[in-house]
Amino acid sequence: MNAPVWWQQLLLAMTGGALGSGLRFAIGASLIQRFGTGFPWGTLTVNLLGSFVAGVLLVWLDARGPSSWPLRALLIVGVIGGLTTFSSLMMECLVFARTDRSTMIGIYLAVTLLAGLALVVAGARTGQWLVAR
């Protein structure tokens, strides 16, 4: 199978991005309804979920070879890119600083980065396990 041309990959990434953004909105709204707005549970959840799924997909798609480029565009660039959000993470740190909760910034960043790294590694290992089956 030939690699898709750039515009095909662009359309796949845009479609996946719309799906990922919709998922982010739904997850965030659900967690705000359940836990309130005192802590950004939605952003933390989507970033950690996205880290794990990105690890799985990266290894799984890599094992499929060049024919996986359309799926990479759709799932990793699109869905995971739309689901996860660095800008919201930074904005929420600013909100913590502006509402006299600066101590939460370090905790939030540490949990996000350390758990995100652990989850992307766990996802990659899960992907290796899936490929080996």
UniProtKB/Swiss-Prot annotation:
One of its GO terms (biological process) is cellular detoxification of fluoride. NCBIfam families: PRK14218.1 (NF010814). It is found in: Cell inner membrane. Pfam families: CRCB. Na(+) is not transported, but it plays an essential structural role and its presence is essential for fluoride channel function. GO terms for molecular function: fluoride channel activity; metal ion binding. PANTHER family: FLUORIDE EXPORT PROTEIN 1-RELATED (PTHR28259:SF1). Na(+) binds at G81, T84. The gene is fluC. It catalyses: fluoride(in) = fluoride(out). Keywords: Cell inner membrane, Cell membrane, Ion channel, Ion transport, Membrane, Metal-binding, Sodium, Transmembrane, Transmembrane helix, Transport. The keyword Cell membrane applies. It comes from Xanthomonas euvesicatoria pv. vesicatoria (strain 85-10). Belongs to the fluoride channel Fluc/FEX (TC 1.A.43) family. This is Fluoride-specific ion channel FluC. GO terms for cellular component: plasma membrane.
